[in-house]
Amino acid sequence: CKLLKEHGHTVIGWDTEIHNETNDITGYCDEYYNIDVTSRAVCGIYDAVVHLAGRSVVPQSLIEPTEYYRVNVMGTANLLEKISTPHVLFASTSSAWEMASPYARSKVAAEDVIKEKADGYTIFRFFNVSGTDGVNHQLGDPTHLIRIAAEAASGRRDKVEIYGTDYETRDGTCVRDYIHVVDLSNAILNAIESGPTNTPYECLGSNTGYSVREVLQTMQEVTGKKLNIIEAPRREGDAVSSVVDTLSKHVTLTKSIEDMCL
């Protein structure tokens, strides 16, 4: 929202305010509404719609699969039924290839809904989004590694757990691709201004994989803090490795893994 406003776009924001204690995008919107993507209140005519709504925590999806299909799939269908726009930009997931969790499967199903119902679309498969633009808009309890490690480095968390150390990777821990939120936001802006691609999907990442141990080591080097690292069993639903093979043409990388740890 902030970047779109800075580039002269009129921004209408929808959110459920689930994370109301820290979520305040109203200052970056010309209009703002507390609306759930599954609600009958969804409506309107727009030049483009950036669909970021949905449930996104893999372990939770294993416990509440029906809720993930309701929000991520039915919510997407509801959105496309109620709005009119020539361009839907959808935030899908890098988990889509292995489909090892209800979360991943719900996102793939939502992709299919968009391909069937949208007049024009750009489907982005987000890899691990990290970092800030210098303003704290982090929502709720952290579920992603870099933010968890940052909390441990700042003393707000007493440990960081590594879930699985016996994977077939260079150091036995899972490997992920990370993209800074600033680079991701610029890619979305570029896509809005370029128009729909109507291709199966595009990848938003960095084309570089980092293991869990490598990320934690980088956090320690950047912050100068030693983390209390605990090795734990593998976690159901985790992919061994997830790294971009071909980046979206809309991505220009300006930030490093070190920037994400600041």
Predicted feature descriptions by range:
Residues V49, I63-L89, D112-V113:
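NAD(P)-cofactor binding segment of oxidoreductase domains
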Residues H51, A77-A104, G120-F124:
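Conserved Rossmann-fold NAD(P)-dependent oxidoreductase catalytic core, especially the SDR/UDP-sugar
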Residues A100-F127, R147-R157:
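Active-site Tyr-X1-5-Lys
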Residues A96-P102, F124-H144, E168-T173:
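Flexible, glycine-rich beta-alpha linker
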Residues V37-R70:
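NAD(P)H-binding glycine-rich loop region in Rossmannoid oxidoreductase-like domains
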Residues C1-A48, D141:
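N-terminal Rossmann/SDR dinucleotide-binding element
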Residues Y69, V73, A100-V108, Q138-R147, ...:
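Short-chain dehydrogenase/reductase
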Residues C1, I148-L262:
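C-terminal substrate-binding subdomain of Rossmann-fold SDR/epimerase-dehydratase oxidoreductases
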